[in-house]
């Protein structure tokens, strides 16, 4: 009986089906009523909604104005999800979740291809899934998981292209898609590939026709958005996109202050990549050793995949750990292979049921319990999407923006825009300026923190009319506009509230 169970758990087909099905349940489970966060999920979801409703797929819009900080591919994919599921928080995270599942599968498949060992492949997928950073981000509507998938797919095409040159085409297309996902960060497969090909086979490999064709495809696909927007907007696009703070690896303040910031990503990994961090460090060292001493192709491949993005990204002062998700599949494979070398076969057989059990337990926690242990399991933007957004939608005309009083430019701007279908206008910080604006334009509506509204009521009695308030926000207008306030929703199609 035990032998049959162990044989089933070690079967490649069973492992693949289990990983794909479990990942789908983990990443898409309990998503219908969670909502999306203001940062950065609603920001990207709003962009996807606007490009979905616009006439041009190549121009990314925000507040109906061209914006150049992000390429359009993730928004195209989210737009397709909107087409299928309707505009909702679920559709906003759908493509990211699917790419999370595909990255899990690709990690398993690539590791199996490299080492021909189902245990190492399954454990690599397990390491990628846990701890929860990758899991949590796969349940959110950001760009990093999508980038991780395209980079992983590109690296898969690169290593398989050594034996079958047709895979260099996959390498090129996936690299191009990575660029269309997150701009210059998507070029890392080319940088890694050039170093790897030269290290592995010198100029002969580097100038292989199939490989150069793959790079050409990558540049053609990846640079298409640059070319289209440069053609439409000229130098304004170039300056706006490439001078953005997020695009600069080496900042103007590079030499100012302590250079200890170069260790920022290492510190973040040390805090968050447990329990695998010590093994990942030792494993990376061992892979580097085999790369330089033994010229082992697979060790070179994974070592460069991890080290090149890590070292280059560490030079940036804009360090966020999720930007490194593109190296997490390689780290998972290094960690898995290293631990496998330390264990006997009997120990591996004993650990396999535990890994399956942990994955099943996670599926149950996500889908059948109310546990809120990660951002993506919390109720996000609840104060906006469940009630305020509906009142803003019906009481703010489509061409009129809702204004903020003592709220920041960023919060809750994007969640409010996504859930109410209304844009955000001016921000006023002083009460006298607010009263002056209300006197001039009494039909305008305003949003503020509820405690700020209580102070306004106290200091200016009879001047303001509260349309609706919850525990966090108050939505109000002038007393002169009271009769125009709408509370009847019976004949109104409300925007998304989930």
Describe every region a protein language model picked out.
Residues 177, 186-298, 305-317:
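Transmembrane-lumen/periplasm boundary regions of multi-pass, lipid-linked membrane glycan transferases
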Residues 94-115, 153:
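Transmembrane-helix motifs of polytopic, lipid-linked glycan transferases
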Residues 93, 136-146:
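Short acidic/glycine- and proline-prone juxtamembrane loop motifs at membrane-interface regions
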Residues 24, 366-483, 495-496:
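Short periplasmic/luminal acceptor-recognition loop of GT-C membrane glycosyltransferases, typified by
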Residues 14-20, 107-130:
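Transmembrane-helix signature of polytopic, membrane-embedded enzymes
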Residues 317-344:
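Hydrophobic/aromatic-rich transmembrane helices and adjacent perimembrane loops
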Residues 24-28, 43-66, 73-76, 80, ...:
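Extracytosolic helix-loop segments that constitute the early lumenal/periplasmic catalytic or substrate-binding loops
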Residues 112-114, 118, 154-170, 339:
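Membrane-interface transmembrane helices that cradle and orient dolichyl/undecaprenyl
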């Amino acid at each position: 009986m035990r032998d049959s169970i162990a044989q089933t758990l070690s079967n490649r087909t069973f492992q693949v089906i289990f990983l794909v099905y479990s990942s789908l349940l983990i990443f898409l489970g309990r998503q219908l009523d969670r909502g999306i966060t203001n940062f950065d999920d609603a920001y990207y979801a709003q962009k996807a909604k606007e490009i979905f409703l616009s006439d041009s797929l190549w121009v990314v819009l925000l507040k109906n104005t061209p914006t150049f900080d992000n390429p359009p591919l993730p928004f195209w994919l989210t737009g397709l999800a909107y087409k299928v599921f309707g505009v909702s928080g679920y559709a906003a995270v759908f493509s990211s979740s699917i790419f999370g599942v595909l990255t899990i599968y690709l990690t398993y498949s690539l590791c199996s291809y490299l080492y021909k060992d189902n245990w190492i492949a399954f454990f690599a997928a397990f390491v990628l899934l846990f701890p929860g950073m990758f899991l949590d981000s796969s349940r959110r509507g950001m760009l990093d998981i999508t980038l991780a998938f395209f980079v992983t797919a590109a690296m898969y095409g690169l290593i398989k292209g050594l034996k079958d040159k047709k895979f260099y085409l996959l390498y090129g297309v996936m690299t191009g898609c990575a660029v269309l996902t997150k701009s210059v960060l998507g070029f890392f497969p080319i940088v890694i590939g050039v170093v790897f090909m030269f290290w592995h086979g010198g100029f002969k490999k580097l100038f292989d026709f199939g490989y150069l064709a793959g790079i050409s495809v990558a540049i053609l696909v990846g640079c298409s958005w640059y070319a289209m927007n440069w053609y439409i907007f000229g130098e304004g696009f170039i300056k706006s996109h490439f001078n953005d703070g997020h695009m600069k690896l080496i900042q103007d303040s590079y030499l100012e202050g302590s250079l200890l910031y170069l260790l920022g990503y290492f510190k973040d990994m040390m805090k968050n990549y447990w329990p695998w961090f010590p093994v990942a460090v030792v494993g990376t060292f061992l892979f580097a050793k085999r790369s330089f001493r033994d010229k082992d192709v697979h060790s070179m491949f994974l070592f460069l995949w991890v080290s090149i993005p890590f070292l280059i990204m560490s030079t940036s002062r804009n360090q966020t750990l999720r930007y490194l998700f593109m190296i997490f599949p390689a780290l998972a494979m290094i960690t898995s292979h290293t631990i496998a070398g330390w264990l006997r076969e009997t120990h591996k057989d004993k650990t396999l049921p535990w890994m399956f059990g942990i994955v099943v337990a996670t599926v149950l926690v996500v889908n059948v319990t109310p546990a809120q242990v990660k951002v993506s399991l919390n109720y996000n933007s609840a104060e906006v999407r469940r009630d305020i957004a509906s009142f803003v939608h019906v009481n703010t005309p489509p061409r009129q923006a809702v204004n903020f009083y003592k709220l920041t430019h960023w919060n809750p701007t994007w969640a409010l825009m996504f859930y109410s279908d209304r844009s955000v206008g001016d921000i006023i910080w002083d009460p006298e300026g607010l009263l002056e604006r209300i006197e001039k334009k009494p039909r305008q509506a305003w949003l503020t923190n509820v405690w700020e509204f209580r102070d306004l009521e106290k200091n200016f009695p009879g001047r303001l009319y509260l349309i609706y308030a919850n525990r966090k926000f108050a939505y109000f207008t002038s007393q002169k506009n009271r009769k125009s306030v709408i509370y009847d929703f019976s004949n109104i199609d409300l925007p998304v509230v989930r």
